[in-house]
C-alpha cells in the first residue's frame, strides 16, 4: 500500500523509514532529501523493501494513507495548502498545541477533514532509534478503531503499535510531556539529584493528567505509553530536544541562545505558553507549566527551580 509522509525533518524521515518496511512510501518536503535518504534506502533495500521516494505535493496526495510530521505551529497552514479530501485517512505524528489559536491538534484537523478519518501517533520514541530499527511500542489513537488498526498494521516488525481511542488524551499527553521534559533538563542541569527529579516527574504526570482530564482525557492514557512512557523517555534523555533546552537554561543561557544552539524545533517551548493560557482561561491548576513559563520569560533558573520544587 502507498503511504505519503509529509515532513522531511528527522521525525518525518524516521517514520518514512519505519513504514517503508511493509509499504511503498513517498515523502514530501521542501528540502532536498537525496542525501539524508540514501542510508535509509540502503537499509530498506537490504531487507527487500522498496526505497523511499521524494515527490511533490500533488503526487503525494495520490497515496492511500497520509502521515503528517510537521511542526504543530504550521499544521493549520499545511492543511489549508494541501486541500486534502474530506475523507482522507490521516495519521498526525506532531506533538504540541497551536499557540496562535490555543488549539489542540484534533481541533485544527477537524476544520479540514472528517474527525473519523483522523489518527494521532503517541508514545515513547526517538527518530534516531527508529532509523536504527531499535524496538519500541507506540499508540495510535483514533475515534475510528478500524482506521487506527489499519495504520497499526502498516508499522514495521520492530514497532509494537497499539490501537486505542481517546485521541484528546493522547494528543494532550504528547504535548504536555515536552513541557515537563524541559523542567527535567533544568533539574539535571542544576544537579538537584535523583529525589528531586523523581518528585518533579511524578508531580508532572499528575499535572498532565489533571489538565487532560478537564478536556475528557482518560486516566489510563496518561498512565500508559502515551503519557508516562513518553514523559519518562523525553525528560531523561539527551536525545530529547526539550530536555536539551532545559540543560541549556540550567547554564543560565538566554532562551534565544539555547534555541539557536539547538538548531531544531523544540515544541515544548511554545506549548508551555499555550498550556498556561488555556489553564488560566479554565481555572486548571498547572504549577509546573506556570513556573516554567516564567523561567522561559527570563526568571532566574535557581529561583524558578526552588519555587517549582516547593509548589509542584
Curated annotation (Swiss-Prot):
Sn-glycerol 3-phosphate binds at residues 95, 123, 125, 177, 230, 240-242. Pathway: Membrane lipid metabolism; glycerophospholipid metabolism. The active site is at residue 177. GO terms for cellular component: cytosol. One of its GO terms (biological process) is glycerol-3-phosphate biosynthetic process. Keywords: Cytoplasm, Lipid biosynthesis, Lipid metabolism, NAD, NADP, Nucleotide-binding, Oxidoreductase, Phospholipid biosynthesis, Phospholipid metabolism. Pfam families: NAD_Gly3P_dh_C, NAD_Gly3P_dh_N. It is found in: Cytoplasm. Its EC number is 1.1.1.94. Its main location: cytoplasm. NADPH binds at residues 11, 30-31, 95, 127, 241, 265, 267. Catalyzes the reduction of the glycolytic intermediate dihydroxyacetone phosphate (DHAP) to sn-glycerol 3-phosphate (G3P), the key precursor for phospholipid synthesis. Belongs to the NAD-dependent glycerol-3-phosphate dehydrogenase family. This is Glycerol-3-phosphate dehydrogenase [NAD(P)+]. It comes from Helicobacter pylori (strain Shi470).
Amino acid at each position: 500500500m502507498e503511504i505519503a509522509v509529509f515532513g522531511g525533518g528527522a521525525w518525518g524521515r524516521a517514520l518514512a523509514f519505519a513504514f517503508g518496511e511493509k509499504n511503498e512510501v513517498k515523502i514530501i518536503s521542501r528540502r532536498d532529501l537525496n542525501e539524508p535518504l540514501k542510508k535509509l534506502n540502503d537499509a530498506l533495500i537490504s531487507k527487500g523493501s522498496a526505497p523511499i521516494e521524494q515527490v511533490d505535493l500533488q503526487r503525494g496526495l495520490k497515496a492511500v494513507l497520509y502521515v503528517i510530521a510537521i511542526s504543530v505551529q504550521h499544521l493549520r497552514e499545511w492543511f489549508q495548502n494541501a486541500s486534502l479530501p474530506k475523507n482522507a485517512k490521516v495519521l498526525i505524528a506532531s506533538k504540541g498545541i497551536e499557540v496562535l489559536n490555543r488549539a489542540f491538534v484534533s481541533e485544527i484537523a477537524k476544520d479540514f477533514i472528517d474527525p473519523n478519518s483522523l489518527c494521532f501517533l503517541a508514545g515513547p520514541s526517538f527518530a534516531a532509534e527508529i532509523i536504527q530499527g531499535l524496538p519500541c511500542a507506540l499508540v495510535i489513537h483514533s475515534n475510528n478503531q478500524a482506521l487506527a488498526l489499519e495504520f497499526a498494521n502498516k508499522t514495521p516488525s520492530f514497532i509494537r503499535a497499539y490501537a486505542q481511542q481517546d485521541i484528546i488524551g493522547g494528543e494532550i499527553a504528547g504535548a504536555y510531556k515536552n513541557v515537563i521534559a524541559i523542567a527535567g533538563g533544568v533539574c539535571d542541569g542544576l544537579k538537584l539529584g535523583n529525589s528531586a527529579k523523581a518528585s518533579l516527574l511524578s508531580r508532572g504526570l499528575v499535572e498532565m493528567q489533571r489538565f487532560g482530564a478537564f478536556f475528557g482525557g482518560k486516566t489510563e492514557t496518561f498512565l500508559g505509553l502515551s503519557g508516562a512512557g513518553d514523559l519518562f523517555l523525553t525528560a531523561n534523555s539527551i536525545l530529547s530536544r526539550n530536555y536539551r533546552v532545559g540543560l541549556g537554561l540550567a547554564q543560565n543561557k538566554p532562551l534565544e541562545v539555547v534555541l539557536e544552539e539547538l538548531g531544531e524545533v523544540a515544541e515544548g517551548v511554545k506549548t508551555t505558553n499555550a498550556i498556561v493560557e488555556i489553564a488560566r482561561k479554565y481555572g486548571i491548576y498547572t504549577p509546573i507549566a506556570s513556573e516554567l513559563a516564567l523561567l522561559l520569560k527570563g526568571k532566574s533558573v535557581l529561583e524558578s527551580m526552588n519555587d517549582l520544587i516547593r509548589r509542584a
